[in-house]
């Protein structure tokens, strides 16, 4: 559990409240353990988990790289087919232009050995386990799988697929270091994680790099919900997707909404709704999802409706 590794999870013992300090409520003490930072088990199981880029230097010691370094590493990598190289250089240009403060060293490290595999639908299904998949980044292999015979024109779905998979490659990195330790740098938190919500936020990050409005977004329903929520928030932006975990997002939602550990309840419901939709179960109990709509509506109205507004102003 997270508690048993408090120190290794990035909470120094001197930060813990003294036992005799009665003023600290138990919840607050507990909350200190809830945010995913890192777990360093290199001395026991030869594993290091980094959920928050504030701790990246536990894994990566080289200096930050320039855009030119990124372009060079893409050009030098023989496992990236030539047709993808200009696309990937363009992706890097946009990330550097739009998100100058995100941590990109894991991405640089991934790009050194990244392989892009053009495959058939059957081959893609074997790695993605998803019949609806158009592409897949497999962290354990550091490979992007995409369907063969696609043209990657800006504005097309296939263009979005490449940006989506590159965004996974930017955010997550699994590798073995020179001392034989397995290193996991990932958005998937220790204390909260699900696939649809993580995918939706990754999708939003990917399409935010376009210079046009993209309405047909992967994980559409969840993406739309997160788009509204993030636009309302003054304490979270898509930079934070790269720099922090999904648990951090939940914590920022709670802080923004002045809730006590409620965001993960909503995220769990959104995860269920996604799976119910594909299992054709959403009609069975539609009111089960009402808290999601209430939550998003309250955020939106709280942000945009002001006391004394006319109906016209409110509609605008």
Regions found by a protein language model. Name each.
Residues 38, 58, 66-69, 73, ...:
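Charge-rich, solvent-exposed alpha-helical interaction surfaces
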Residues 219-316:
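Pan-zinc metallopeptidase signature
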Residues 157-176, 203, 207:
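Active-site recognition of the HExxH zinc-binding catalytic motif
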Residues 186-224:
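Post-HExxH zinc-binding segment in Zn-dependent metallohydrolases
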Residues 72-144, 151-153:
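Auxiliary, metal-adjacent structural segments of Zn-dependent hydrolase domains
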């Amino acid at each position: 559990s997270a508690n048993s590794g408090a120190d290794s999870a990035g909470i120094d013992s001197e930060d813990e409240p003294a036992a005799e300090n009665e003023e600290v409520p138990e919840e607050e003490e507990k909350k200190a353990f809830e945010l995913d930072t890192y777990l360093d088990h290199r001395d026991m199981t030869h594993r290091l988990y980094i959920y928050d880029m504030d701790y990246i230097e536990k894994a990566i010691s080289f200096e930050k790289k320039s855009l030119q370094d990124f372009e060079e590493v893409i050009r030098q990598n023989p496992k990236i087919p030539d047709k993808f190289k200009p696309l990937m250089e363009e992706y890097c240009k946009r990330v550097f232009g739009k998100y100058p403060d995100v941590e990109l060293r894991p991405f640089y490290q991934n790009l050194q050995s990244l392989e892009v595999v053009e495959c058939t639908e059957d081959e893609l299904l074997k790695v993605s386990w998803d019949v609806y998949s158009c592409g897949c980044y497999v962290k354990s292999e550091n490979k992007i799988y995409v369907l063969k015979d696609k043209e990657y024109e800006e504005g097309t779905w296939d263009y979005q697929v490449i940006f989506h998979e590159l965004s996974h490659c930017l955010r997550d990195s699994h590798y073995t270091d020179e001392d034989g330790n397995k290193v996991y740098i990932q958005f998937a938190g220790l204390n909260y994680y699900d696939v649809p919500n993580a995918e939706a936020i990754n999708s939003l990050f990917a399409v935010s790099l376009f210079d046009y409005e993209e309405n047909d977004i992967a994980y559409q329903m969840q993406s739309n919900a997160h788009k509204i929520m993030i636009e309302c928030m003054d304490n979270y932006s898509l930079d934070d997707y790269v720099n922090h975990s999904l648990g951090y997002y939940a914590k920022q939602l709670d802080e923004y909404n002045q809730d006590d550990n409620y965001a993960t309840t909503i995220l769990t419901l959104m995860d269920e709704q996604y799976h119910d939709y594909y299992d054709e179960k959403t009609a069975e109990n539609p009111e089960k999802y009402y808290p999601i709509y209430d939550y998003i509506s309250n955020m939106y109205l709280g942000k945009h409706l002001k006391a004394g507004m006319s109906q016209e102003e409110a509609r605008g």
